[in-house]
Structure formats: C-alpha cells, structure tokens
Amino acid sequence: MSDVARRIYQYGTWLMLVVIIGQFTAAGAGVFSTMADDASGAYILRYHTIAGPLAVLILSLVMIIAAFIGRLPWRMTALAAAFIPLLFLQSLFIIPYRYPTDIPTLGGMPWLSALHVVNALFIFWLAFQWPVWTRRDLRELSQRRAGPNELEAKPAQAAMHV
C-alpha cells in the first residue's frame, strides 16, 4: 500500500504542475479576452477563480494523505501542505481588486492585489521544482531502505551483465 501511495505522490506532483500551468493559462486568457470585450473571458476567469483553486486544494489534500500512507519524510508532507496557505493568500491578495467597496481600507490599496501575481509565481516555482525534489527524495529514501549490502551488490551484478 505504501508503494502505491508513493506512486500517487510522485505522479501527483506532475499533475499539480499541469493544474498550475492551467491556472496561469486561464488567468491570461480570461484577462485578455475580457479586455478585448470577448464574453468568453468571463467564463475562463470563472474557471480560474473556482475550479482551479478547488483542484489545487483537493490535489494537495490527496498528496498529504498519500505522504502519510507512503510514510514519506515530513519535508515531503510539508511540500504538499504548502499549497494550502499559498492558495489562501491568493484569495486574500485579490480582495482589494475584486471587492474595493466591501473593505474600504483595502479598497484604497489596489496595489496590494499585485501580490496575487507574485504569489502565483511562487506557487508556479514550487510546483515546477516539486517533481524534481520528489524524484530525488524518493531515490534517497529507497537507497536508505535498501541498505548498504544491496547497494554494493547491484554494481557487481551490473558488471557481470556487461
């Protein structure tokens, strides 16, 4: 079961990257379509604001569960969990732009919404690095569990097949 959970975690990191790229694409398409008075831009932005964050949240929760079941190191569990507060910050940073009259103090600071893009870039960087870090961590984990005797035997076996 833990091997299956590790595979789910490993493939989930790539899926998260695809979802985040989809979020960037939807945001750009939605903004530029809306600026061009294309009504389809509103639907694309609706995906960006509802379906995309929901997919990131659900995938993060699945990854946290997979990390626990797979008995992965805490660092790997924390990486999966890191997307949740970053997602929460995304929602907070857009408030001054989307709802300027609801919270007058924040409405006077529309520049604060620029942090929405900065945070999105950090989320993208994290999602981009995550599969690489996961591959490295899983390789180190399997080497530690294999023990020194098995690691010494593998090069000898490889030399015999040459």
Question: Language-model segments: what does each one mean?
Answer:
Residues 1-162:
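Polytopic transmembrane helical bundles with strong interfacial aromatic enrichment
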